[in-house]
Amino acid sequence: MLLVRYLSPPIGAIIFVFEVLKHKRLLVDGWVIAVGSLTSYGVARLLGSTPLAIGSAPTPVLWTFGLVGVLAALCSVLFITLLYGSERFLVRFFPNRALRAVVGGGVVIALGVMNPTALGLGNSTIEELLLFNNAGLWFFISLGVVKLLTTSVTLGSGGSGGIFSPALLIGVAIGGAVGVIAQSPAPVLLVAAMASVVAASVGSPISGALILLEYTQLWEGSGAVAIAVFTATLLMRLLTKETIFTKRLTLLGVDSSSYRVH
């Protein structure tokens, strides 16, 4: 329900759980998820949390959304590879948990010097870029690279953290970079990129798009977002059958299809 608390997408959050898990039991107990999501949304609104509502904005040419989708899929594959690769590397060469945590923390601090905004959840960075996107190409490239590496090292060294927020920041970096190159830094490009990275890396194309559209209220850009998400999802399926979650199950020797709805 933290997703609802920070981004205020009650419907998208419900679909997200069903789309990612596809667990047979959810067909019976799905109402619990719906109640939890809507309750969290209601409490968050009472505490002052609201959707971003960035308003209308010009839509860039369509080829930029196709490019965003391609880059999102490639970065998602890289994200999964780096995440589990860094874990294997650190566990192998630093078997002591305490030492592994120290090494990981040192690497994260060193990487953070390149772009400090890549550290943390990044909610304020995302909102600022959506509302006032005046950053340069180097900022977006360094943001994406540093976030990919710091998230991989943090989780690989035994630290705590999620996947959704890093995926959003990586998406912002992709959308921002494409916007600078195409000389069209529109918010809808960032929204499409965030939705595409979530869709490709987590395996949630429908909820990925819906969550970001609910969050930004940029419904007039839904067609363009759909192009990017479809491109990212299709290319991701061609490149790998794994998502960032199913990869973990595969490494543990668990057949995820045994409890999924087909």
How would you name each of these model-derived features?
Residues M1-H262:
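Alpha-helical transmembrane segments and immediately membrane-proximal extracytoplasmic
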